[in-house]
Curated annotation (Swiss-Prot):
It comes from Danio rerio (Zebrafish). GO terms for biological process: anterior/posterior pattern specification; brain segmentation; canonical Wnt signaling pathway; cell fate commitment; cell migration involved in gastrulation; cell proliferation involved in pronephros development; central nervous system development; determination of dorsal identity. GO terms for cellular component: apoptotic body; cell surface; extracellular space. It is found in: Secreted, Extracellular space, Extracellular matrix; Secreted. Expressed in the margin of the pregastrula embryo destined to be the future mesoderm. A lipid is attached at residue 187 (O-palmitoleoyl serine). SMART domains: WNT1 (SM00097). This is Protein Wnt-8a. GO terms for molecular function: cytokine activity; frizzled binding. Glycans are attached at residues 104, 263, 282, 348.
Amino acid sequence: MNPCQIFASLVMSICCHILSSTAWSVNNFLMTGPKAYLAYTSSVQAGAQSGIEECKHQFAWDRWNCPESALQLSTHKGLRSATRETAFVHAISAAGVMYTLTKNCSMGDFENCGCDDSKIGKMGGRGWVWGGCSDNVNFGDRIAKLFVDALENGHDSRAAVNLHNNEAGRLAVKATLKRTCKCHGLSGSCSIQTCWMQLADFRDIGSYLKIKHDQARKLEMDKIRMRAGNSADNRGAIADTFSAVARTELIFMEDSPDYCVKNLSMGLHGTEGRECLQSGKNLSQWERRSCRRLCHECGLKVEERRIETVSSCNCKFHWCCTVKCETCTQTVTRYFCAKRHRNRRPHNHSRKRQHTRRG
């Protein structure tokens, strides 16, 4: 089962099973989803793919690195969790689907959708008017909500948390929109501008949601009222808890497990054997500290390995019409987390640093 299939199923419903013997099918989802929206299935799948790629990028140097095994396990009802990481998965899923639907809409890929022209000709501010082709985020929001939220049919606190994080992901797409303008006027005077709203790069949305993940808020539900199950008391407790939470915030209910330690029952492989970065150009502070975070703070040492890589080089074009290359071997130094000779307990403060914001 490839990453897109695993994550696409997760996008549709965290509570659905992923069958180990068969690939996930968009049609399977649509058996219970909105059948009127068959035209959008390829966009939904593409959005799911962009979601998993962005998740892996954002968490590449974190202890939890968006592993496919953990995503697959989290689709099983008995193994569902409502951690900080699950919150991000829901948000980036919803954002990816909405983003792709919006983009395809603006490109004219759907018969019933195009640019958002609701503001064209209206004054937007001093010296500029609305024009051009604004990305139709309201369309993307509406269809993504139907797809991603449709199968979250529970009425408990976990379902409410998932739906909240889905919405936070969609709001992230809107929050990162950029205004693009074109100048008009004699001799390039730019006396007036025509402006429209454009989707940001999806990487910007991923970074925005990563910050939201780092700042995610833990909910403390009223357990006495929650014992009533799906009763009015249950719904009242959920409503009271959510009343003070901003719609743009990511929320979770359970503390994250110790990602330093291998736990195969949860799909976690620990950080032993993980690569980290110690040097290199244009590294962020978060990347430069990855060896400390993944290795030292998990009771592991940093092991230096010299690895030979083979690649094509000195390529030349020969008339006509071939390109001939030489084969070059290069030795590079890479760093990995490895066991110490003596077992040492991880630093007590390592868990606290786990969700520190990137530098």
